[in-house]
Every structure is written in structure tokens, then in C-alpha cells.
Regions:
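Short, conserved sequence motifs used for protein processing/export or organelle targeting and
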Residues: 1-110
Length: 110
């Protein structure tokens, strides 16, 4: 899950920009770091359609980030909360596990 239009501090060379607009900020990963197998075998055919469904709670994912952010925990200045659900996107990709080449990517506004 990514979020767009987060306005926060950014270092731009020697200039500190306190109102920088960040886009495509990673907010959460739904499955594990390297994803998951789409099906039990690795035999795929051209134009094959595979459907997976997930039930997620945006507020639970947001709270997880707040609870595990170093900036929030130790410095009190993290930007892990206050997700704007109007600016969230889901990004899904398929990659070759052998060489890590990205084969297909799709992004959808939630």
C-alpha cells in the first residue's frame, strides 16, 4: 500500500524543505517481503488468469506502523499515522524468482 501527497520535511542538498510533497510512500506490505506463490506449481500458461483476495484493515496496518516506527517510539516525530484513505493505492507485481526481473506491475487507487 502506498500513499501520495504526504507533505513533510525533505533534505534537498543544502536546502531543508519543510513542505515537500512525497508521493508513492510505502505504507504497508500485505504479504511477506518477497510476496507469495500465485499457485502451488510454477507452471503458467499465456493469458492465464489467477485471482487472489485479501481482507485487510487499513486502521490495523496504520496502527502497526505507529507501534513499530523508530521515529515515533524514540523521537516522537514520525509520520506513520494519519493515513489519508483518499490518497492510498495498492501496488501489485509479478516477478521472476530466479533473476528478480519484474514481469508485470499494476497500481490501483483504493
Amino acid at each position: 500500500i502506498t500513499e501520495d501527497s504526504i507533505v513533510d520535511w525533505q533534505k534537498n542538498g543544502s536546502y531543508d524543505d519543510s513542505v515537500y510533497v512525497h508521493n508513492h510512500v510505502l505504507r504497508a506490505i500485505i504479504n511477506n517481503t518477497w510476496g507469495e506463490n500465485l499457485k502451488s506449481s510454477n507452471n503458467y500458461t499465456a493469458n492465464e488468469e489467477i485471482n487472489l483476495s485479501y481482507n485487510i484493515s487499513i486502521s490495523s496496518l496504520e496502527q502497526f506502523n505507529i507501534n513499530h516506527s523508530t521515529n515515533e517510539l524514540f523521537m516522537g516525530n514520525g509520520n506513520t499515522g494519519a493515513w489519508d484513505t483518499n490518497k492510498l493505492n495498492i501496488v501489485a507485481y509479478i516477478y521472476n524468482v530466479d533473476n528478480k526481473e519484474i514481469i508485470q506491475v499494476e497500481e490501483l487507487h483504493l
